Amino acid sequence: MKEFEKASLILSPLRRAVQNYGMIEEGDKIAVGVSGGKDSTALLCALALMRRFYPLKYEVVAITVDLGLGMDYTPIEKLCADIDVEYVRVETDISKIVFEKQSEGCSLCSRLRRGALHTEAERLGCTKVALGHTKDDVCQTLVMNLFYAGKIEVFWPKNTPDGRNMTLIRPLIYTTEKSVKEFCNKNALPIVKNNCPMDKNTVRQDVREMINEAEKKNKGVNHRIFRAIEKMGIDGFSDFGE
């Protein structure tokens, strides 16, 4: 199996999240949703690597939901071969559906992608679906919902979606975007270029830039937002201390 440098950047916070929230159980078959971006690719590599020493035995399979945007996932397929992980690509026409209904845009795309991912994971007999949302994503989601929807809400670290027989987990919730970037760069991990015309032109991107600017003026803003989420117990988060 491929060796990784600076693996502790990802493995240490990932293992802590997995243990704190009981994300992995003996005999799990975990489907990692791999978009080809840095977060999901780093998550895939970390979960594959952790199989070596984690006390509970589990399997990993990588699933890419191809939106029909002409993106080349060959590098991800090769990476999966290098780390001994089964790779499955699901072809869809989601992009066509989404751009015919532009009023719903990104939210519709997200729902359709998630549905296709869960359906394929169920077909493969998986017990868990892992997504690559980071600590930064948690904070951005809170600010987005507060500013644009008038509610205090984030996504759950671990939950079972309605109508599904498997658990959704987010093992990177303690991992910063900065650590993910450093890990990916250090190991020259393949990142698939996103051909979506909405990439970098979303509300989330605006909020990301807003928080980054606040971080420059007042270091630790991101971490304090995250700690507030934990202390308030929002959507399944718990306060396990610093």
Where are these regions (language model features)?
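ATP-dependent adenylation/nucleotidyltransferase module used to activate substrates
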Residues: 1-140, 148-151, 178-186, 236
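Catalytic subdomain that performs nucleotidyl-dependent activation
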Residues: 60, 113, 136-216
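Residues that form or immediately flank small-molecule/cofactor binding pockets and catalytic motifs
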Residues: 67, 92-94, 173, 196, ...
